[in-house]
């Protein structure tokens, strides 16, 4: 007589392993995240890639059009303007946010009640809901009655036409992004705590100046953390422009703040051109990936040069 293992007996043996063994507990705790990532990120991304090659308006069935949507993007002045504005924002906002987070972390990494309160104040804008944050800046940037221009007028400085002219409006969006660097500040505060104090004591004994110590000890040891923040900001910063551009300017003035997320929304939900919107999203994936790969390769080559 042959013995067979029934599914019920196999599951009975599997359940104790899942609950008691270390590997089983690791899988048990990571399974919700893996399932959520698969269902909410990976599958929608794959579906989006498929829709990019179709003509789809959510009413009629999708119709295969090949690369027509990508040709339409190349020929669209608005799509080219949106991509250029988005890249300009990234090239200004990402380095500025990284430098701001590093500066605040260096100033506030000491202990004490004052520094603890200052860290909380620096982190506070990060937890404000994006809609409320955008409405607050809509009031601050009012060119006639906003507190920013009133303060500049009291100091005898020029009062830019925020939200009216293209240049000041683009600068205003970069300025808004600088007040939500709390997460980067926290990461760099943790990084500063991981640097052994013995390095600074040895440098002090050798008579090194504060600038030399920062340049030769602190900055090199922070570079991996700063690279992580740079890659994160490349992906996240552009996404975070949607609420601000939707609430404050709706892409204006003169399409200056029609960044890719807002244009995606307009194509999909104003014009119901889901195929073209999906193609634009695929292009944004490719551009973001190229930027990330370029930065990683640049840092890798720099590290090899230093090692040589």
Could you say what each language-model-derived stretch is?
Residues 22-308:
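A structural signal for multi-pass alpha-helical bundles of membrane permease subunits
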């Amino acid at each position: 007589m042959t013995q067979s293992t029934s599914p019920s007996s196999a599951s009975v043996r599997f359940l104790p392993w899942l609950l008691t063994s270390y590997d089983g507990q690791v899988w048990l705790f990571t399974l919700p995240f893996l399932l959520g990532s698969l269902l909410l990120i990976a599958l929608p991304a794959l579906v989006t890639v498929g829709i990019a090659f179709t003509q789809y308006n959510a009413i009629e069935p999708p119709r295969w059009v090949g690369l027509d949507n990508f040709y339409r993007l190349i020929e669209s002045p608005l799509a080219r303007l949106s991509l250029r504005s988005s890249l300009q924002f990234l090239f200004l906002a990402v380095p500025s946010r990284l430098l701001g987070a590093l500066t605040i972390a260096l100033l506030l990494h000491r202990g004490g009640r004052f520094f603890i309160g200052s860290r909380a104040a620096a982190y506070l804008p990060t937890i404000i809901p994006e809609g409320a944050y955008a409405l607050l800046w809509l009031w601050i940037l009012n060119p006639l009655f906003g507190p920013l221009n009133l303060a500049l007028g009291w100091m005898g400085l020029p009062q830019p036409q925020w939200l009216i002219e293209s240049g000041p409006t683009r600068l205003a969006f970069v300025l808004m992004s600088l007040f939500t660097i709390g997460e980067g500040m926290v990461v760099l505060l943790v990084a500063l705590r991981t640097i052994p104090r013995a390095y600074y004591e040895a440098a002090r004994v050798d008579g090194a100046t504060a600038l030399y110590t920062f340049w030769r000890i602190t900055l090199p040891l922070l570079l991996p953390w700063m690279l992580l923040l740079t890659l994160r900001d490349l992906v996240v910063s552009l996404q975070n422009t949607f609420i601000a551009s939707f609430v404050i300017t709706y892409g204006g003035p003169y399409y200056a703040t029609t960044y890719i997320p807002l244009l995606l929304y307009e194509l999909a939900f104003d014009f119901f051109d889901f195929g073209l919107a999906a193609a634009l999203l695929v292009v944004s994936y490719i551009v973001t990936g190229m930027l990330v790969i370029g930065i990683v390769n640049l840092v890798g080559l720099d590290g090899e040069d230093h090692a040589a």
